[in-house]
Structure formats: C-alpha cells, structure tokens
C-alpha cells in the first residue's frame, strides 16, 4: 500500500478568499431572511459560531443543535461553491501534487462541509487529484482534530500533513503526524516540523 500524504483545502490547495467571502455572504443572507442588518456584524467576530446558533434559533425555532448546524453548513456550502473559481487554485501546488501520485496516495482532510468538497474540486479542475476525501459531516461543528483522529483510525498516519500554519498544524503534531506549514496563501502563526514559503521548497 502506498504511503499517504495529507493536504488541507483552505490555505494550501486554495486561496482563502472564497471561504472568507462565503462566511460574509452567509451572515448577509440571514440578515435578509430575518430582516435584521445587525446580523452582518457577526461575520467580524472571532467567536462567530455562537452567533450562528443564535441566528439559527431565530430562524428555525427550538430545534436540536444538529439540525441548526446542518442548516447553517448547507447554506455555507452553497455560498462557498458559488464563490470558488479556478483563480483561487494554487496551480503550482497542484502540479507538485500530481507529480506525487505515482508513489503516494493523496488525501484531502478538510473541515469544509462534506457536501461542498466534491463540487469545489470539480469547479477548479481537481476532481481526480485525491485518492481519499475526508470531510466534516454536515451536522457537526467542524473539528479538525477529530477528523485527524478518525482518519488515523481508518487509514493510518499520513507520512506528512501539508497545511496553512494554523491550529490544524498543532493537532497534526500532537497526533504524531509530521506537519509541513505553508505560507503561500497567508503567513501562518504556527510552524510545522517544516515551514516553507513557496511550493518550490517542498
């Protein structure tokens, strides 16, 4: 069995723009539906997910948390798919990954909602890039550490995880997965076992 190299979506394979715009668009749509312009301000909060629940309670009434999250993430998925374009793809990284496919299995491990990942990859011409897609279930709050743990139980540890320098790198290292933090989309705050600025350094 070929060893696995795992990759993140936002900040490694793709620019962060479509995810950031979808985030703002989500709050805008809900502000229209609830006729409350103040909802737009929630998009700027660090702890915005508590406001997602608040907005969903106002919109859906007294339903369970899983239903609220599922509705919220479905709307976010639709907004992200609408936003993403081929211009958001880190083309040289894709070329690098394609060169690895003969010797390695490529896994995309992302907290993006599961229903959005295949359409996003299709829109940017990467439907055939990954051997394994490991995504976040629609009804759960996105949690990358849990995804890593579940992935390792099912497939074993990747030989490397390549992602932007955020808390995902910490989770990867804590689980004994060697991490490569990349800075070609944005400068990360967390350094992996290897920290690189451009694709040519891989």
Residue ranges and their predicted role:
Residues 1-5, 118-202:
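Asp-based, Mg2+/Mn2+-dependent phosphohydrolase catalytic module
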Residues 1-42:
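Active-site neighborhood of HAD-like aspartate-dependent phosphohydrolases
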Residues 12, 19, 114-115, 167, ...:
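Conserved Rossmann-like nucleotide-cofactor binding loop
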Residues 23-33, 49-65, 120:
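Helix-loop "lid/cap" segments that line or gate small-molecule binding pockets
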Residues 25, 54-58, 92-95, 99, ...:
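Alpha-helical elements of Rossmann-like donor-binding domains used by nucleotide-donor carbohydrate transfer enzymes
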Residues 56-94:
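Metal-dependent phosphoesterase signature
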Residues 80-108, 118, 145:
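Short, acidic loop-to-helix structural element flanking the phosphoryl-transfer center
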Residues 110-112:
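Conserved phosphate-coupling serine/threonine residues in phosphotransfer and NTP-handling enzymes
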């Amino acid at each position: 069995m070929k060893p696995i190299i795992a990759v993140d979506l936002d900040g490694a394979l793709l620019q962060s723009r479509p995810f950031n715009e979808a985030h703002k668009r989500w709050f805008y749509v809900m502000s229209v539906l609830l006729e409350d312009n103040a909802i737009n301000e929630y998009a700027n909060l660090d702890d915005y997910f508590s406001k997602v629940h608040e907005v969903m309670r106002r919109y859906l009434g007294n339903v369970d948390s899983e239903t609220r999250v599922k509705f919220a993430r479905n709307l976010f998925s639709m907004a992200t798919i609408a936003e993403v374009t081929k211009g958001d793809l880190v083309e040289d990284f894709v070329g690098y990954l394609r060169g690895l496919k003969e010797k390695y299995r490529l896994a995309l491990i992302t907290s993006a909602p599961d229903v959005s990942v295949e359409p996003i990859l299709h829109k940017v011409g990467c439907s055939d890039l990954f051997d394994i897609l490991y995504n976040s279930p629609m009804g759960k709050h996105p949690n990358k550490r849990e995804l890593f743990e579940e992935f390792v139980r099912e497939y074993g540890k990747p030989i490397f995880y390549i992602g932007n320098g955020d808390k995902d790198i910490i989770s990867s290292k804590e689980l004994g997965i060697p991490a490569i933090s990349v800075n070609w989309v944005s400068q990360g705050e967390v350094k992996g076992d290897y920290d690189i600025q451009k694709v040519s350094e891989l």
